Swiss-Prot record:
Signal peptide: none annotated. The gene is gyrA. This is DNA gyrase subunit A. The lineage of its organism: Bacteria, Pseudomonadati, Spirochaetota, Spirochaetia, Spirochaetales. Belongs to the type II topoisomerase GyrA/ParC subunit family. The active site is at Y126 (o-(5'-phospho-dna)-tyrosine intermediate). It comes from Treponema pallidum (strain Nichols). Residues 38-504 form the Topo IIA-type catalytic domain. It is found in: Cytoplasm.
Amino acid sequence: MEEISTPEGGVLVPISIETEVKRAYIDYSMSVIVSRALPDVRDGLKPVHRRILYAMEEKGLRFSGPTRKCAKIVGDVLGSFHPHGDASVYDALVRLGQDFSLRYPVIHPQGNFGTIGGDPPAAYRYTEAKMARIAESMVEDIKKETVSFVPNFDDSDVEPTVLPGRFPFLLANGSSGIAVGMTTNMPPHNLREIAAAISAYIENPNLSIQELCDCINGPDFPTGGIIFGKNGIRQSYETGRGKIVVRARFTIETDSKGRDTIIFTEVPYQVNTTMLVMRIGELARAKVIEGIANVNDETSDRTGLRIVVELKKGTPAQVVLNHLFAKTPLQSSFNVINLALVEGRPRMLTLKDLVRYFVEHRVDVVTRRAHFELRKAQERIHLVRALIRALDAIDKIITLIRHSQNTELAKQRLREQFDFDNVQAQAIVDMQMKRLTGLEVESLRTELKDLTELISSLEELLTSPQKVLGVVKKETRDIADMFGDDRRTDIVSNEIEYLDVEDFIQKEEMVILISHLGYIKRVPVSAYRNQNRGGKGSSSANLAAHDFISQIFTASTHDYVMFVTSRGRAYWLKVYGIPESGRANRGSHIKSLLMVATDEEITAIVSLREFSNKSYVFMATARGVVKKVTTDNFVNAKTRGIIALKLSGGDTLVSAVLVQDEDEVMLITRQGKALRMSGREVREMGRNSSGVIGIKLTSEDLVAGVLRVSEQRKVLIMTENGYGKRVSFSEFSVHGRGTAGQKIYTQTDRKGAIIGALAVLDTDECMCITGQGKTIRVDVCAISVLGRGAQGVRVLDIEPSDLVVGLSCVMQG
């Protein structure tokens, strides 16, 4: 290796390459941090933004004037202040003018400045811009020595180290940037709330962050949306870091055919709507989110943001919303990092820090402005006094000037004879003849008076820190009054810790109806009006000529509904997964929801809150066979189904109830037999077993239902001709499994066979439904409590050609 020679007059100093790399990287890092990525806490601007606004101010591109080509603006910034790429300057200029990027844009754009959908702005040779009116407050008083200036990159000009910034840019518009080893991500806020917080701080500098939070509710994003939870907001205000969950704002519209459409009118901050629509479409095509028929971005200047998600008929909008929030940016987290430069060094800042540093900056600006104005006023009053003296002795002064050979001699004589100084003498010799009028003399005397008052006011201001703070407070209030507006982002207290369907679905009692031909729907219980015993009922379904309601059940929207078919297979759905329909609609076919074979019917429905090994599904077949299986055996059933009960040839499953191990059950037959027995008499079995004999039947009798015994309740039976009664459980003694049971009802042709039974409280209501779709909702207390052998009372006045086919208890709450 060739030996390096020592330069003439120089010294070679050996250094460690590791040390040099570290030093160079730190220098580079600090350059990026200070000169590029992080905003100054005082005016809230990064250097490129500050240079853009200052260059536009220097070129007179104020709001009252015309716009100028962005190419010219970018060129001015590059040539005088920012020796970097033109793309970075133009990108920064564009962002300052986007109303979806900044809460209060400081650039007034002309032309295509990009869209929220990610469309790029037009090239800078096509677009124009000028300062927005609010931006003028950022540079106001900059000519009054309110801020310090430094030489530009080539010493050909000077640029401000900070702008006067009467408008609290950092709090109002936030900031984002990535430096070396650090990043900032500060949210925007509402200007009126910021002004209130600044006023509160000025009045009481010792106030707590919580008291500041009483003024500033939270971030206010330009794209609106809804913030969920206040913990993240509070944490970010107290520590400078926090996570804020934002969701899109939406409405749900239903067309005449019952199809729902979800319309999003606001999205979380910084969400690209084009990518969002593409993401929703991909999820819909991949069947990750089911039920979406179409999605369109209908955003326009006339309608504003509008993303339309059309759903297939029968699809619950709440379920789709849940998936959209979970799998797309329609719910996003804004990670707050309040990092800004304080005296040239990056610092993590609390809300109070941000307010304090802004107030301190404005105090410095107001103070420096007052000193400048005081100096200018003193200089002017010095001249005005001289001019007034000169006008009072105008004849002598005119004679003196006329007899002077040149200007310098005239000024010398003025100094000697009238005791004027150089500045005053120069002003007198420069005075125009029009100033000799009486009106001008009076004007000077008025100006002298005004200047005297101004000087007194400024001197008083500079000696009173409280008055300086008062000016800061007033000017901030004036900005808020001029440019402040209502909040765009709402805040709700609910925290979102995890996403679940139930988070979006109101708990509500639903009536689930299944027709003989397999149509299923859910209808809110509130849709049925209460009627007295003997009422005519109201239509519950608009069914085909040969169809009729065969099953009716009530459950909460958050419950699981287990369907057990005539062939002994089990399926389940969440209640909200069953399409909701009006009372007159027939609903959706069961085969569109469950994978039910063509030769099986839903014959039993069980509602349960959760699957467990402590609870059982107790099933009964038409031929009296019973079986008990823990509910956790059915976790995987879902819509594809699994075996629940192995049936003998010709037998069908007719009923099932949810029981605990210690419960007693009662089997009731169509011809009026009731067997009360202990549930322990039936051992726990696996899903593939056939069950055991539960009740001994005659050759013509069949099981009509099975109940869980509760002494607080009574047995309610209903016959096919609309007669019913209540009987106390205490009238039945416990018998062994496989016995015939006791009499509960005597069947007659006029009243018909038993079609169903319920265990009810006096405060319950029951619902009956006929094969022709008529329903009646009746208070249980209106149905008489009778003995085991009584025939019952008329509950439903039905047509001779109609029969009661279903009975259900309507749960309260």
